């Protein structure tokens, strides 16, 4: 059984992943995979360099991630081009990791932030969605990424609205509360999952 885990930016998905890992389930992390491929010499690093040029690099040759984020989130056209350029490479790498882990484990998770936006839903037996209110999401994103309200709003607006994701979720994990509430909900879901398998 493969479970997709998703949620909007700053929804608390990373905390949910840690709780799942503590329960001894393996999690393929799409963001980490992307990060690894964006290091100097990686597949995405080269694709981004070919697309945007050397202006996106720091003096040491690494990607200037804040600048890259500003460029990509500056317009719908830039987001679309980024998805086109990076999406195919990411999908190939995630599929390879999924297929490899499926040979070892009967149950595992894949943490994919843009699961619905990039049409990954057919990959999964279940989809767990971490949900927060727009106000909580904006506050967390501003604090975590040191963004203005306008910058945070642009990033949130670039993702599919929560209401459109809800019908596709097997489980919705409400994360408007505190960490203890979240742990209780996720541990309960993991217990239910163990009873299914």
From Swiss-Prot:
Its main location: cytoplasm. Keywords: ATP-binding, Coenzyme A biosynthesis, Cytoplasm, Kinase, Nucleotide-binding, Transferase. One of its GO terms (biological process) is coenzyme A biosynthetic process. ATP binds at residues 10-15. It is an enzyme of class 2 (transferase). GO terms for molecular function: ATP binding; dephospho-CoA kinase activity. Pathway: Cofactor biosynthesis; coenzyme A biosynthesis; CoA from (R)-pantothenate: step 5/5. It is found in: Cytoplasm. It catalyses: 3'-dephospho-CoA + ATP = ADP + CoA + H(+). Residues 2-197 form the DPCK domain. InterPro entries: Depp_CoAkinase, P-loop_NTPase. Its EC number is 2.7.1.24. One of its GO terms (cellular component) is cytoplasm. Catalyzes the phosphorylation of the 3'-hydroxyl group of dephosphocoenzyme A to form coenzyme A. Belongs to the CoaE family. This is Dephospho-CoA kinase. It comes from Streptococcus thermophilus (strain CNRZ 1066). The gene is coaE.
């Amino acid at each position: 059984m493969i479970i997709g885990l998703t949620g909007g930016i700053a929804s608390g998905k990373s905390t949910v992943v840690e709780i799942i890992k503590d329960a001894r389930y393996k999690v393929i992390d799409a963001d980490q995979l992307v990060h690894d491929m964006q290091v100097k010499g990686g597949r995405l690093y080269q694709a981004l360099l070919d697309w945007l040029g050397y202006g996106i690099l720091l003096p040491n040759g690494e990607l200037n991630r804040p600048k890259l984020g500003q460029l990509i989130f500056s317009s719908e056209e830039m987001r679309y081009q980024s998805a086109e350029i990076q999406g195919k490479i990411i999908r190939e790498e995630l599929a390879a990791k999924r297929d490899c882990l499926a040979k070892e484990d009967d149950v595992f998770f894949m943490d994919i932030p843009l699961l619905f936006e990039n049409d990954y839903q057919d990959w999964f037996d279940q989809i767990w969605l971490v949900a927060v209110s727009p106000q909580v999401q904006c506050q967390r994103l501003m604090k975590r990424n040191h963004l203005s309200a306008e910058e945070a709003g642009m990033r949130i607006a670039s993702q599919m609205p929560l209401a459109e994701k809800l019908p596709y979720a097997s489980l919705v994990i409400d994360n408007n509360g505190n960490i203890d509430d979240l742990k209780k909900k996720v541990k309960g879901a993991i217990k239910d999952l163990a009873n299914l398998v």
